[in-house]
């Protein structure tokens, strides 16, 4: 009997494995693809295929990431797995792989380890909304009480970083035994994916979110007025909609009088479209690159925020020397560079290339931002770091 053809109609959800080195993230990834391929169609991926992750570039930073996909009975999952700890840090901070939820893999034989904690903290800082837990290597632990203890420790760790430890699904299994086909452990993989289906909500579609367009260019067309161009980041825009221009200068209100794409007039534009938008009553000098056009009231300009930052190593083309407090690079948000000053956490004197660190940044001009917005850190046009807005201060 032929496998059913791949149905695009299933909701699409992005997930990834996180957790300490050698706790079995990649083995679990292989196990899920194998079990789901057998149950729901699709293709299994072997450990070695996943482990030899190809290099990709995100915001000028090289990251090794493996992408696999699989089907549950009611969803299509895209799943990322990284070979090294540094790749996780970079991946989560650059948002190269946006996760709707994460699978925290923790070895039942070892319990939570430093990277277990660090990945939970990173998930909190970069806005991964949901975590499900897979306690791996349970076949190596005979003592029921020890398993319960490890489960309790993981739940407490989640609580410490404001994830709901008590409500988080925790599945106990063995990825290796599942790959080897031992039925009780195959069932645990099915249980894990069912928990993901239940506990991780399908993300809101980009078109359902409030409209925002980062402005790339501004033209004035004689007899018609001012046109701003850019790619719609999220939402939908209709001719006649009221919008605000936010960032850098005081916020201005205007009305959309035309939307065009490839020189054709449209009634509306939506997330992903590269468009020109004709705005009423604004002059060319009233608007500049780096501002955003957005649904009124949906996003505010801010200058001071806390960020989680990854600083490129020398090998990645970053700085060769550390930086200290008072460091003033440019912060590249969406389409423009804004100078800002850096405050380091208490007790931190300097930051070395290759570090990841939490810092407070004060920009000289306000930028339209929400928590979760990504940015690059640049010095004279060269990328030296990547960051994500973790918390807005003012």
Curated annotation (Swiss-Prot):
It comes from the Bacteria. GO terms for molecular function: GTP binding; GTPase activity; guanosine tetraphosphate binding; translation elongation factor activity. Residues 136-139 are annotated as: G4. It is an enzyme of class 3 (hydrolase). One of its GO terms (cellular component) is cytosol. Pfam families: GTP_EFTU, GTP_EFTU_D2, GTP_EFTU_D3. Keywords: Cytoplasm, Elongation factor, GTP-binding, Hydrolase, Magnesium, Metal-binding, Nucleotide-binding, Protein biosynthesis. It is found in: Cytoplasm. This is Elongation factor Tu. It comes from Francisella philomiragia subsp. philomiragia (strain ATCC 25017 / CCUG 19701 / FSC 153 / O#319-036). The lineage of its organism: Bacteria, Pseudomonadati, Pseudomonadota, Gammaproteobacteria, Thiotrichales.
């Amino acid at each position: 009997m032929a496998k059913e053809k791949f149905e695009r109609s299933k909701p699409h959800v992005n997930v990834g494995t996180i957790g300490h080195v050698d706790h079995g993230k990649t083995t679990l990834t292989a196990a899920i693809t194998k079990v789901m391929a057998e149950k729901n169609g699709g293709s299994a991926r072997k450990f070695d295929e996943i482990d030899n992750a190809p290099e990709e570039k995100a915001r000028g930073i090289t990251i090794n990431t493996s992408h696999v996909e699989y089907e549950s009975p009611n969803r299509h999952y895209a799943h990322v797995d990284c070979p090294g700890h540094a790749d996780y840090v970079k991946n989560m901070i650059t948002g190269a792989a946006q996760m709707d939820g994460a699978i925290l893999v923790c070895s039942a034989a070892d319990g939570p380890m430093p990277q277990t904690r660090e990945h939970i903290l990173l998930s909190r800082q970069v806005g991964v909304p949901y975590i499900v837990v897979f306690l791996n290597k349970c076949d190596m632990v005979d003592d029921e009480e020890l398993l319960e203890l490890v489960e309790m420790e993981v739940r407490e760790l989640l609580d410490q970083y404001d994830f709901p430890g008590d409500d988080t699904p925790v599945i106990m299994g063995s990825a290796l035994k599942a790959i080897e086909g031992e039925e009780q452990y195959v069932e645990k993989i099915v249980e894990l994916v069912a928990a993901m289906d239940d506990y991780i909500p399908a993300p809101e579609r980009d078109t359902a979110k409030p409209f925002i367009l980062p402005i790339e260019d501004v033209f004035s067309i004689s007899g018609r007025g001012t046109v701003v161009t850019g790619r719609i980041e999220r939402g939908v825009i209709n001719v006649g909609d009221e919008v605000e221009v936010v960032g850098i200068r005081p916020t201005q209100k205007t009305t959309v009088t035309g939307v065009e794409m490839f020189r054709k007039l449209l009634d509306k534009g939506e997330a992903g479209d590269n468009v020109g938008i004709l705005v009423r009553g604004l002059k060319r000098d009233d608007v500049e690159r780096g501002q955003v056009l957005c649904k009124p009231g949906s996003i505010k300009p801010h200058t001071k925020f806390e960020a989680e930052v990854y600083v490129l190593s020398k090998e990645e083309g970053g700085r060769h020397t550390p930086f200290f407090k008072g460091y003033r690079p440019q912060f590249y948000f969406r389409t423009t560079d804004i100078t800002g000053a850096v405050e380091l956490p208490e007790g931190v004197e300097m930051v070395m290339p290759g570090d990841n660190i939490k810092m407070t940044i004060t920009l000289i001009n306000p930028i339209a931002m929400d928590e979760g917005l990504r940015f690059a850190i640049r010095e004279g046009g060269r990328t030296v770091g990547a960051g994500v807005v973790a918390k807005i201060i003012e």
